[in-house]
């Protein structure tokens, strides 16, 4: 933790480290999306950094978004941002990175993580997508396509990106197509 704290200080970034014991039995029964929902609920209820904020960006823990500063400078704090992971599949939203007003998250997304059932193929992405569709929630693409690198916590998938493909996605994102 000391290395991370040093890095945050040198980067002039506020860092808060939260730790809690989630419901391990329920996470095993329902899957990693359930555990992620528990974590987000804990963060929303206990984070000192979020107390004075109206908006947040969530990035999955093992991933780096190389253009996060560029993205956050362009976000409008009254909007909800998700991308779709694959433009040929518009029936699911990407939960590796999303952003929205905190109250919108608390009201519309935080309560539904309990519907996750990995064994039945119902992942957090499905549950959030269902909320968006059923409630008619207006969602925007990120203003710049996220340059994501890292490793998936569930399947060990390695995420990398190609800059030229991201440039094309940047243009397409302006039309809210991703």
Where on the chain are the PLM-derived regions?
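ER/Golgi luminal nucleotide-sugar-dependent glycosyltransferases, focusing on the catalytic module
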Residues: 1-178
């Amino acid at each position: 933790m000391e290395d991370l704290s040093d890095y945050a200080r040198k980067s002039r970034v506020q860092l808060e480290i939260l730790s809690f014991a989630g419901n391990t039995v329920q996470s095993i029964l329902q899957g990693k999306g359930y555990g992620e929902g528990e974590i987000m609920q804990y963060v929303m209820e206990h984070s000192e950094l979020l107390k004075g904020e109206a908006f947040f960006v969530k990035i999955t823990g093992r991933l780096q978004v190389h253009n996060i500063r560029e993205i956050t400078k362009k976000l409008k704090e009254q909007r909800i941002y998700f991308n779709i992971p694959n433009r040929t599949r518009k029936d699911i939203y990407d939960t590796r990175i999303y952003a929205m007003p905190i109250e919108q998250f608390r009201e519309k997304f935080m309560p539904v993580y309990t519907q996750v059932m990995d064994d039945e193929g119902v992942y957090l992405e499905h549950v959030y997508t269902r909320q968006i569709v059923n409630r008619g929630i207006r969602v925007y693409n990120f203003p710049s396509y996220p340059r994501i690198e890292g490793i998936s916590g569930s399947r060990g998938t390695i995420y990398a990106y190609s800059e030229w493909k991201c440039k094309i996605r940047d243009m397409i994102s302006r039309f809210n197509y991703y």
